[in-house]
Amino acid sequence: YITLQRSKTAREAIKTMAELVANYGYISSGESFSIADPNEVWIMELIGKGQEKGAVWVALRIPDCFVSGHANQARITTFPLAGKNKNSITSKNIDKLLKNPNIDCVYAADVISFAKNNNLYAGPDGQFSFSDVYAPVDFSGARACEIRVWAMFNQVVDGMDQYWDYATGRNINRVKPYVAGKAQTPENFPTNRMPLWVKPNEKVSVLDMMAFMRDHLEGTELDMTQDIGGGPFHCPYRPRPMGWEVDGVEYVHERATATQQTGFSFVAQCRPNTISEIGGIIWFGVDDAASTVYCPMYTCMTAIPLCFRE
């Protein structure tokens, strides 16, 4: 919220967030941020340093005409290193982010050295993977998180079948197994992860985005309306917890994009060819995204509508 108050562009937001965590620290676990303005969209992933002050992070600009997604699992893997790529900088030169429009990667200066100093990574700098070092994907990270990204990608681009076994957590390929507490090398990284972004077959609309939010894995073998848990009325809702055990066998409910415990969801629309007062719209909906009605909330609003205020 502080960043929203202080920033007018995605680049300013990244700089503000980086400076805030550097000055005041960051105690929370990892988080992924979609940061957009009318001209650019960035994805930034950030995780605290435990007992040390600050955070390690990476921010990448999503290329024009591409789409990306994240769902509670870090997704940035390797990234271009400063010094070897003129469009990449570290936090030491973060002021350049505002001055040079060609910069499309910026990261904490110690994102790799911190991992090495804390026995998290023992490989070459050029093969360092943010997600695989700081938030290694496991079964639940794939089945409950990555599968939601897969569901969206699968609706906009061909060829996503090749990532199905990965997204379901059935087959996370590694040359060598990941061992918690042991410094990783690139051989411990999955070799079949989904790309961070894909180029859609056609332009994605606001209505498409709303439809993605309503997904229950329909049309796949994990379609929540079709399995035994759906009952005779093909209900996509499942009680929590997501996992349980019977007679020594573990089972899981699917974690689709739309769930019954959602408090609110929204689709943010930035329109560069409209006056700024009404160019930004938050299509806001309360409760379950599958059945919500998305209502336009303009960025020029100074008061919350009574029906939402109550």
Where are these regions (language model features)?
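A conserved hydrophobic secondary-structure block that centers on an alpha-helix together
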Residues: 3-32, 38
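C-terminus-biased signal that marks the final domain/tail of proteins
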Residues: 14, 18, 29, 38-41, ...
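A short, sequence-level motif marking secondary-structure junctions
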Residues: 46-52
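Surface-exposed ligand-recognition segments of extracellular binding domains, strongest
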Residues: 59
